[in-house]
């Protein structure tokens, strides 16, 4: 019963569209502001210095490529699996730094106004995203094809979800910015 519900075209379309929007909205600012993203990568201190710049150059293109792969029905299951793997890697990178006590750094997920400090909550978020992506990779080959109504509802719901997440992230960033400026004033 639950598997049939999860394999509903409107559900798979929603998850697919959400991952497309998430990956594209994460990749584009990294491409536009490469030096800033390079600084974020270096700040994680998980790789040798000489590898940080190539990684910072390749990662946004990988995110964008996976987003494009999710658009195409023939490559969507593979792209969903790759998205899940990427979320696991991001979660591990965040978890390592949280365990080190390095929570004051930006996760690099999005850009400036949406800076998010590292936390176990972000690790959990990435675990949930990985689970959704791996589930999508598993369900897409057996899910019925989406019709126009499924596509419209799935993409609209994904777009609204992204807007809500962006809004919450912006408000959180404004709150933490206000708190840090109050602390610096004494």
Curated annotation (Swiss-Prot):
Cellular compartment(s): Cell membrane
Gene: mauE
One Pfam assignment: MauE
Keyword Hydrolase: no
Species assigned in the record: Methylorubrum extorquens (strain ATCC 14718 / DSM 1338 / JCM 2805 / NCIMB 9133 / AM1)
Segments passing through the bilayer: 2-22, 54-74, 76-96, 129-149, 151-171
Membrane topology: Multi-pass membrane protein
UniProt-recorded name of the protein: Methylamine utilization protein MauE
Cellular component, GO, one term: plasma membrane
Main location: membrane
InterPro entries referenced in this protein's UniProt entry, alphabetically: Methylamine_util_MauE
Function: May be specifically involved in the processing, transport, and/or maturation of the MADH beta-subunit.
UniProt KW keywords: Cell membrane, Membrane, Transmembrane, Transmembrane helix
Pathway: One-carbon metabolism; methylamine degradation
Biological process per Gene Ontology, one example term: methylamine metabolic process
């Amino acid at each position: 019963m639950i598997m049939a519900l999860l394999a509903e075209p409107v559900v798979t379309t929603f998850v697919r569209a959400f991952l497309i929007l998430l990956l594209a909205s994460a990749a584009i600012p990294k491409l536009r502001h490469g030096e800033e993203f390079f600084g974020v990568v270096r700040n994680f201190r998980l790789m040798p210095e000489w590898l940080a710049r190539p990684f910072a150059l390749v990662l946004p293109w990988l995110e964008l490529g996976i987003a494009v792969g999710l658009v195409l029905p023939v490559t969507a299951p593979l792209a969903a699996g790759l998205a899940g793997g990427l979320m696991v890697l991001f979660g591990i990178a965040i978890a390592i730094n949280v365990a080190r006590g390095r929570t004051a750094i930006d996760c690099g997920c999005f850009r400036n106004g949406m800076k998010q400090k590292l936390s176990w909550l972000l690790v959990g978020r990435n675990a949930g995203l990985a689970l959704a992506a791996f589930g999508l990779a598993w369900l897409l080959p057996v899910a019925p094809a989406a019709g126009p109504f499924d596509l419209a509802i799935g993409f609209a719901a994904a777009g609204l979800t992204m807007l809500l997440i962006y809004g919450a992230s912006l408000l959180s960033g404004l709150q933490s910015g206000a708190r840090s400026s109050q602390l610096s004033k004494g």
